[in-house]
Amino acid sequence: VRIPASFCGLMGIRPTHDRINTNGVYPMAPSFDTVGWFAKKIEVFQKIGDVLLNNNETSKAIFKNYVIAEDLLEIAETEVQNEFKKFIDLKLPGISKVRLSTLTKSEIADNFRILQGNEVKENVLPWITKNKPTISPEINARIEMASKITNNEVKLAKIFRNKLVKEVENSLPEGV
């Protein structure tokens, strides 16, 4: 949502998974699907957010600490990293730094693709098979890849996901 919005000169947001109710939304990959929106005017963007995010709900989370996830920052381009570090040094000089995981970016991406692809296979492939729509070669290649994902690959990817979740949870101090 954010990248297409920025290319079109719009504001766009992709909220946290499950933050907005997805009832009535056709599932693609339910473990990852979320509802986002675009708008050109800030007033419209805000009104949509007020409706979709239901601002009457308040979080019960109490944040006592904030941290910098160094391994996530390392993914950013060098210029972005440097500017971010300057800002942190200036505004939050004592902030703690953590590493969320020992797993590599490529391992995480590969397992994400398996889990997401399997959900696409379960949710979208039956519709495509039945309706035979015209699909771009790029999307067709992704659908083809998803159709070949095995149950064993999914099982291993779920084990990997559980390991990643535990690593992230264990890396964060209380109250973050």
Regions found by a protein language model. Name each.
Residues 1-69:
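Fold-level recognition of mixed alpha/beta catalytic cores in primary-metabolism enzymes, strongest
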